[in-house]
Each structure stands twice: as C-alpha cells, then as structure tokens.
Amino acid sequence: ELSCIERWAEAHRAELVVFIVLPISWWIWLFRTIKRKCSAPKASAHAERVRDVCAAVAANAASSDVSGAPLLMRTDRSVYESLSTRNSDKTQVNQVPLRALHAILGLDDDGVLHCEPGVTVGEATRFLLARKRMLECTLEMEDATLGGLAMAQGMTTHSHVCGLLHETVVEWELVLGDGRNVTVRRDNEHADLFDALPLSHGSIGLLVGIKIRTTPSKPWV
C-alpha cells in the first residue's frame, strides 16, 4: 500500500515535473555546459591526447592480474555521461583517458568535418551552422556523441532518406588493443576494418578521431 507522500506525489506528478524536475535539470544542463566550455581541449593538442590513449592501452596490454589474465579496460567517462541502460562499475578496471577527446579539429574545403569522438551532436551542429553546413545525418539527441553514434547505431527519424550516421564516415582514427594508432579508410592498408567498425561498440579499437561528410544547410526546415 502506498504511503500518504507517495499518493500525493502520484496525484501531483505533473506539478512536480514542471516546477521541480525541469528547473533542476536546466540548472544541471547549464552547469555542465559552462564546465565543458571552460575545459574545452585545444585542437592543436590532439596528437598529445592520442599519445596518452596509446600509452594507457599499451600499458594495459602488457599487464595482467594474479591469474595471468589481461586486465579489463573501460573509458574514463562518467556513467551519467553515457547513453546506456547499464550502470558500469569502473573502480576495478584500468580507465583509458578518452574523456578529454571532445575537440572539433576542422572542416575542410570538401565539407568533411574532422573531430574527436566526444563531440556532441549539438556542438557539431552549432559549429557547422555557423559555416552554413550541417551533418548529413542529424540526430535529435543533442547530447549524443558522434563517436558513440558512429560506433553504435546512429539512427534518426529521417534515416530512411539519409541512412545511418556511420554511412557518412569517410575516415576513422583508432587505437588498437596493442596501443598502435592507425587511420582507417576504404583505400588504405586498414580498409578491412572500415566496414567492421560500425556496431562494434569499441570492441575492435578505441576511436580517437573521425571524419564525417556534411552537406550545405537549408534556409528552411
């Protein structure tokens, strides 16, 4: 049987959401946005951040537990930052420094966006709209990261027209399990990995850079 407080909360859930939950969520969003802008990584330091990831992965590959089995690895992103239904315990594993990889590295003359995997859809969209471009596959989830969407299933409500997000990727930059940093394209020596990476969820390698096609933005919706 429900308590008086539970019955009251159930009867007034609309008021609780509008006047308490939404304002709290807005303040949390504002705090996270300011914190992210203040700690924005420099694009020029991309190679240094990748070297840190390579070193962490290589060190993990060279270590083992008491039974001789390789140690587990997880990213150092907080659980609340991940779009996942599972609550992962990262206290007993080696954490790889991927959290700092959220810089936009540039937009070339062909309209290809070069960025780190932690860049969100919202950040990429604002950057591109200022240059009259947009992602070919734009998702409605502003906080979703481009790297996560490309390595998982980045689907949008108009994917029947534009396809999935990973189908707009032209280049992947990976750190493999032995700590090597490789660039994957359809026309280079790692071409066999190109179509294996989508839906792999990081099981083949850790994504540290990505190049995605964009398209001119329309003046109307």
Regions found by a protein language model. Give the residues of each.
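FAD-binding subdomain of flavoenzyme oxidoreductases
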Residues: 149-221
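Glutamate identity and glutamate-enriched acidic tracts
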Residues: 1, 6, 10, 15, ...
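Terminal signal-anchor or tail-anchor transmembrane helices
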Residues: 1-36
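Phosphate-binding glycine-rich loops and adjacent basic patches that engage nucleotide phosphates
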Residues: 11-20, 81-92, 132-136, 194-203
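Glycine-rich N-terminal segment of FAD-binding domains in flavoprotein oxidoreductases
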Residues: 36-143, 149, 153-158
